[in-house]
Amino acid sequence: MKANRKLKTKKQKKTKIIYYTDELNDDFAGTNIKQKKVDSNFKFINKNIFKRMFAFLIYYVIAVPVIWFYSRCIRHVKYVNRKAVRKLKEPCFLYGNHTAALDAYSPGLICYPKRSKILVSPDTVSIKGIKNIVQMLGALPVPNDASGMKKFVQAVEYYNKKKQIITIYPEAHIWPFFTGVRNFKDTSFAYPVITNSPVCAFFTAYSEPQGFMHKLRRANVTVYVSDPIYPDTTLPRKEAQKKLRDEVYAFMKDCSEKYSTHKVIEYKHISEKPENAESDKISPDDFE
C-alpha cells in the first residue's frame, strides 16, 4: 500500500510541457501591460537629495530585509560564490538567466551591501502607482523609443561611476523554471567594454526539492555566481563584447548541465509537438 501511495504521489507531480517558436523573442510572462513611452523625456538619473535619501531608506531598511527573509526563509534560496562580487573594489556588471518574476531579488542579495541597478523592460515603469517605487529599488528601464538611448547610456555610465552594480538579463524574456540557457545577443555586453568594468555571471539552477519543508517547494533553488570576467582590452569593441558574451554563456551552460536537473516545466520547440497535442498553460503559480 505504501509503495502504491508513493507511485501515486509521483504521478501527481506532472511536468508541464510548453512549446515555443522563437527562443530569442517568445515571452511567457503574460503581463499584457500597456507600455508607457520611455524616451528622451524620461528621467533616468535622480539627483534630488530628498528622493535619494528616501530611496536609501526604502532599499536598505525595507526592501533588503524583506527580500532576505523571503528568499532565504521561505524559498530557501542558496547562493554560491557571492564573495566574487563582494571582494571587487571596482563596480561590475551582473548577467543572469531569466526564469522567474522574482529574479530581481537575487542581485540585491548577491551584491549586498552594495546597491544594484537592474535594466528592465518599460513594462516595469508602466504600472500606475509604482513607477517611483520600482525606480527607487533600482529599476532602470531600457528605452522603447530611439530618442531615449543617449540618456539611457549616460545613466548606465553615471551609475557605474557611482560604483553601483548594474544587473542585466540578456535573455530578456521570462521562461519560468527553465533549466537550460537560451541563446542571447552580445548587444548588452557593450556596457562593460565601454566602461572597462568586470563582469560576473550568475545562474539560477533548479534541483529536486529536498531538506526542511521540501514538500512545500516545487524545486530547490541555488544561484551560482562566477568569478570576475574582464573585457579584453586588446580587441576591438565589437570583438571584446562578443568574447564577454561567449564567456558568460559558457559559465551559464556549465551550471545548467551540472546543477539544473529538476524540470518543473519542460520547454520544447514547436517542431517537436505531436499532432493534436496541446501546450500546457503557464499559471500565476509558475511565477515564483
Residue ranges and their predicted role:
Residues 79, 118, 139-141, 199-201, ...:
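Conserved beta-strand scaffold positions in the cores of enzyme catalytic domains, especially
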Residues 75, 145-149, 181-182:
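A conditional alpha-helix N-cap/helix-loop micro-motif detector
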Residues 2-38, 153-288:
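Non-catalytic C-terminal accessory region of glycerolipid acyltransferases
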Residues 87-146:
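Catalytic core of membrane glycerolipid acyltransferases/transacylases, capturing the structured
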Residues 67-68, 136-143, 171-174:
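Short, basic, glycine/proline-bearing loop/turn elements
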Residues 2-93, 102-106, 131, 136, ...:
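Membrane-anchoring hydrophobic helices of lipid-metabolizing enzymes
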Residues 67, 107-108, 131, 156, ...:
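Short amphipathic alpha-helical segments and helix-helix/interface helices
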Residues 83, 147, 205:
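Residue-level "edge-of-site" marker
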